[in-house]
């Protein structure tokens, strides 16, 4: 069995196009809705072609002190220019970006994972505190 650390890659999102970027307030009020946006290629654009694309993003929240994380959302991107005419000839492309509206009861950590069809699994985290 391969350890999680060997499957998932991470790096500074400012220099690596595969790292999920988690955008939300650093601190939120308990039980109040806020938005979390997860994107890839914020500083360095990631290709979105039939041959090289982001297939999905998943977002989790791990409450402080809890053993387990809770899935917030699963976002699939299924159109990458595929067509009967050939690769990159299709009429539609989905952008690898997802937004979730959520609320939390306690502080914790947001975890975003993403899958590139060429370069595998990537992850990033962001701490979330309460006001």
Where are these regions (language model features)?
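Short, compositionally biased P/S/T/A/G/V-rich stretches that sit at domain boundaries
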Residues: 1-29
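Extracellular Ig-like/FN3 beta-sandwich strand-entry sites
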Residues: 33, 107-111
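Short amphipathic, basic-aromatic surface patches that mediate peripheral association
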Residues: 39-50
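Extended low-complexity, serine/threonine- and proline-enriched intrinsically disordered segments
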Residues: 51-73
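Solvent-exposed serine/threonine-rich low-complexity stretches and specific carbohydrate-binding patches
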Residues: 70-87
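Aromatic sugar-binding surface patches on proteins
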Residues: 88-99
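Short, hydrophobic beta-strand segments
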Residues: 98-106
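Short acidic/polar inter-strand loop motif in beta-rich domains
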Residues: 115-125
